[in-house]
Amino acid sequence: MPVRTVHQYIDVYSPRKLDKRLIIGTIHPHVTENFNIPFFYGNIGSFWEILQGAFPQHDFTNLESILSILNKYETSITDIIKECDRENANITRDDLLYNLCLNTEQISDTLNESKIHTIYFTSRFGKNNAAKLFTSALKVNYRKYLDKNESEFIIPESQFGRQIRCIVLYSPSNEANKGIAGGAAAYLRKKEYYKQFKNPIKKFKIEFYREKFQYLNQQVD
């Protein structure tokens, strides 16, 4: 039976305009009551687990610690979808969501009024992925500035008053693993290396996130 998912965290944890970095995802699953953490990516085996593997000196296992880390490193998090429909409550794939209501106003206001210089997208350019919806809704010509080797593009100064670095992550979701194994150039270039690990794709994601979130290694008072 079709269900309407309304985002549980966007308005509770809105982006802080003094922060320097913004993480943008899509939307949580319809059912959130079973989340380990009542927050963005609070379900098992998600974004925070990848960051925990990449930065074991931090604690991404509980809400209080995650909020402390985000605050300490001047990082906000939000999602691009405020509401959407699904054919049933078990649907989690982004490409199967429909009747989307986007969080464009909050994100646009944040970028216009903040000091954010880096955006991280937790999914790429497939149907209803975070980077795809963001660039389409905010009319960002990412193709002109896309560096496929680095998985990054820039938003020029003319759009939000300053140049913004945009980093397109590989989705932390296990549903993305098949696509990574079959078509992610960064993974395929080192496929033989990753074969030695129990979970090659997870190891790849951990190393990719470690490279892109290098600032989490800095000592901050």
List PLM regions with ranges.
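Short amphipathic alpha-helices and their capping/turn segments at secondary-structure boundaries
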Residues: 7-16, 60-71, 110
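Internal catalytic-core helix/loop-beta-alpha segment
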Residues: 72-141
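Short, surface-exposed acidic-centric catalytic microdomains
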Residues: 31-98
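C-terminal capping/extension of enzyme domains
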Residues: 1-12, 18, 43, 90-104, ...
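Short, hydrophobic/glycine-enriched beta-strand segments
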Residues: 16-27, 41
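A general structural motif
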Residues: 17-19, 113-117, 163
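Short hydrophobic segments within beta-strands
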Residues: 23-25, 121-122, 169
